[in-house]
Amino acid sequence: NDCPYSLANHWKNAAHLIGDTEKATKVEQALRAHRPEDAFQGAELEMLKYAYKLTIKPGDMQQQDVQNLRDFGLDDGQILEVNQIVGYFNYVNRLLNGLGVTTSGDTIGFYK
């Protein structure tokens, strides 16, 4: 959701945790191009679609968006967890952007 600070830190950590440079590059390219289907499928892809819509067009969310997650095997607890994580990051990213926080002088990522 267009937060350079969060993207820099969290992507570096995610790439490390993926543990495969080629796969990490494929995932990053797919996400930056807004084409998660190029790197994900099934429930993971459906969660990413849900996250994207909740981030970009929250007013357009419908019960069908939740049902789509159920159709891919997520239970209500898992759906709530996805919802809370997306909502939290949207909130925090808006705080960071609103305060003008940058990575200048920071060590990017947790892992060495």
Regions found by a protein language model. Give the residues of each.
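Hydrophobic alpha-helical segments
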Residues: 1-112
